[in-house]
């Protein structure tokens, strides 16, 4: 299963030749009010160490797929864990995450009896929780996009997270998420790009609250460590 995710990354890189992976479209004005940092070390491996914005940590992850009756039924599941410490985390925070999804393919039509669902809990940050799920089709019309929507809750703050499928210069949206945008109070405050081997995060230049920068970092790490079956 590890090979499947690595292959997807190679395709993403190779498809763009020497110019690198496709960049996701950012919300209007977001680049002007954020600073870009990278999540180094959390590429395609199953475990290792990472660095982001002066913080460091270690991660591990796994994913599997069970096909029954020649893909009539397919069960995807996986889990991940990371611990981060540093200037934004005086007390280390450990995240434990897991996802599940069941799909069914009849001829060329794919159904999802159990839709994608991903959840993270956090030790060291009381009450924090992240839930990401497959989004309901707009207007009830299904598309090829594996759209995701979610919420991160921490100390009374609520952030909404939504997947982005449009690439800069692209003509049609991609099926798998290129990355995610983080919103709060109806305003986009951050984003994380996942296409390629080094996730790129846009952090708020002037966080609205003391914990906002920390929360955005946790959201980004929780997304970067996920092996989404849509990217298979």
Located regions from the model:
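Sec-dependent signal peptide recognition
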Residues: 2-8
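Intrinsically disordered, low-complexity proline/glycine-rich segments
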Residues: 17-232
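C-terminal motif of bacterial Sec signal peptides marking the signal peptidase cleavage site
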Residues: 13-15
């Amino acid at each position: 299963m590890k090979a499947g995710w690595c292959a997807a990354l190679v395709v993403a890189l190779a498809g763009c030749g020497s110019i690198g992976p496709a960049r996701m479209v950012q919300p209007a004005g977001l680049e002007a009010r954020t600073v870009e940092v990278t999540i180094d070390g959390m590429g395609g491996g199953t475990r290792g160490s990472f660095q982001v914005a002066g913080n460091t940590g270690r991660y591990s992850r796994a994913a599997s797929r069970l096909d029954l009756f020649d893909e009539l039924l397919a069960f995807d599941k996986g889990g991940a864990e990371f611990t981060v410490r540093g200037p934004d985390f005086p007390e280390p925070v450990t995240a434990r995450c897991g996802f599940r999804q069941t799909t069914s393919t009849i001829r060329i039509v794919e159904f999802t009896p159990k839709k994608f669902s991903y959840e993270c809990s956090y030790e060291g940050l009381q009450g924090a929780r992240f839930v990401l799920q497959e989004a309901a089709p707009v207007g009830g019309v299904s598309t090829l996009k594996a759209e995701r929507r979610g919420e991160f809750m921490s100390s009374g703050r609520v952030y909404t997270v939504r997947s982005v499928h449009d690439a800069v210069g692209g003509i049609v949206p991609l099926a798998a998420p290129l990355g995610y945008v983080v919103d709060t109070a109806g305003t986009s405050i951050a984003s994380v790009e996942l296409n390629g081997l080094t996730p790129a995060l846009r952090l708020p230049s002037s966080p609205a609250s003391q914990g906002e920068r920390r929360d955005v970092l946790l959201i980004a790490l929780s997304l970067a460590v996920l092996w989404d079956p849509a990217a298979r």
